[in-house]
Amino acid sequence: MRVVLADHGAGNVRSVAAAFGRAGATVALSTDPREVTEAQLVVVAGVGHVRSAARGLGALAGALRTRAERDRPTLGICVGLQLLFDESEEGGSGLGLLRGPVRRLRASLVPHMGWNDLGVVRASPLLGGLDGADVYFAHSYAAEPRDDVATALVEHGSPLVAAVEAGPLAGVQFHPERSGAAGARFLRNTLAWAGGW
């Protein structure tokens, strides 16, 4: 399967590309709206702030909205998950593909950085075999969905959304490219999920 990573200038995108390559995908990094619109699977990945990521997307924002309208699979990773939502407390609007804000963590330890158990709360083909798996997080903000789209939670002072899925849209707050065997399994699950659309 060919995976296109939407290039918005994030620094760790190449490690995500390499992880998808190890999972069996052919991977391209692109700033071309047409390529992003037509790809079999698009991934929006990276670390950083919603405002700078949204600005970095430029014309790709419209391509991602078109994908959602056409039921084409899109995965957000870390700030990519946050971009799927309406807005962020750190400033800036997201894509508005999922309803709800992104808010700063209220926990005493911010950022949430390190390994935590994933708690699957709704069956999802992307999370098959991953309930209770240790995955790696590095974030200071978390999505608060208005709709029932959360598929996994993580405990960090209080339950936080760790994964979402709504039709062809999915996102994870953890970093599969840094999550060892569990992350590799998630990426294989993602490729199988995207192949079914």
Kindly give the residue locations of the regions a language model identified.
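Pocket-forming structural segment of enzyme catalytic cores
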Residues: 86-160
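Cysteine-nucleophile active-site neighborhood
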Residues: 48-116
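Beta-strand-turn-beta hairpins that frame and shape the catalytic cleft
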Residues: 132, 165-170
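Acyltransferase
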Residues: 172-197
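Extreme N-terminal starter segment of soluble prokaryotic enzymes
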Residues: 1-4
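Short acidic low-complexity segments
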Residues: 27-38
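Structural motif
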Residues: 43-45, 171
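Structural alpha-helical scaffold elements that stabilize or flank donor/cofactor-binding regions
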Residues: 35-36, 67, 163
